[in-house]
Design a protein with these regions (language model features):
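Low-complexity, Gly/Ser/Thr/Pro-rich intrinsically disordered linker/tail segments
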Residues: 180, 187-223
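Conserved active-site beta-strand-loop modules that form the wall/rim of enzyme catalytic pockets
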Residues: 12, 108, 151-153
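Polar/charged alpha-helical tracts
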Residues: 37-45, 138-146, 211-218
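N-terminal capping segments
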Residues: 22-116
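...with weaker cross-activation on analogous glycine-rich loops/strands in unrelated enzymes
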Residues: 117-186
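Bacterial Sec-dependent N-terminal signal peptides
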Residues: 1-24
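A generic structural signal for short, solvent-exposed coil/turn residues
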Residues: 5, 102, 147, 156, ...
Length: 223
């Protein structure tokens, strides 16, 4: 079995697990099988496995990729204000570029540079549904408590942005953190200094945007 066949088998296992509701048992990791270039190519080549599936399956697959695979590859990649690396753990990545680069790597046909360099609120409005604004972390937390698990959001702060991910174990902020150039980290939202020190929050859901998900699977431009 060659590398591409191996990855196709992996994708089939993951998709089947999600359809059957057993995604927590799908423990194979992409990182252990292929390098990042092959990961990007094969994810893009094999999204059509879900093209006739209900939106729930597409949503769960995107959640799995962002929460698991993307973080596994990118964890620890340093932050820099001008960081635009295309390769995890090589060079540096700014917060906006972390979001748009990883979405591009998963096959979303978006304006990677334009969205990374615009205001985070504008990026959220172009990519997300169910957009809300809050003036405290407590209010944001209360909102997230009512949202479904396996959800992926983009959050915009005063001068920062990243993913919020809701899992069965809680809500996490995944972002390229500027403090001491820590770079890509994932932390519980109630333990995040970046969130707790902020005064304004705009959040929108990627996984609730069915039109975006369908265009992603069909390899069509989403904007």
């Amino acid at each position: 079995m060659n590398l591409s066949q191996s990855f196709l088998l992996y994708i089939s296992i993951i998709v089947t697990a999600f359809v059957r509701g057993n995604h927590q048992n799908a423990t194979l990791t992409v990182k252990s099988k292929v390098d990042y270039s092959e990961f990007k190519k094969t994810v893009n080549d094999n999204k059509n496995l879900l093209i006739n599936h209900p939106t729930k399956d597409i949503r769960n697959y995107l959640f799995k990729l962002v929460d698991g695979d993307i973080f596994d590859y990118w964890e620890g990649t340093p932050w820099d204000f001008y960081g635009k690396t295309l390769q995890p753990k090589t060079g540096s990545i700014a917060c906006g570029y972390f979001v748009t680069t990883t979405l591009t790597d998963l096959g979303f046909k978006i304006d990677r540079v334009g969205l990374a360099e615009c205001r985070s609120g504008d990026m959220i409005k172009k990519l997300c549904m169910g957009i809300h604004s809050f003036n405290s972390l407590d209010k944001l937390s209360s909102y997230l408590a009512k949202q479904p698990v396996n959800s992926v959001f983009i959050v915009g702060l005063d001068f920062h942005t990243g993913y919020v991910i809701k899992t069965t174990t809680g809500c996490y902020f995944m972002h390229s953190y500027y403090f001491k150039k820590q770079g890509v980290i994932k932390e519980k939202i109630d333990e995040s200094p970046a969130l707790s020190s902020n005064k304004f929050f705009m959040i929108g859901s990627l996984t609730a945007n069915e039109n975006l998900l369908r265009k992603w699977i069909a390899n069509k431009p989403v904007m």
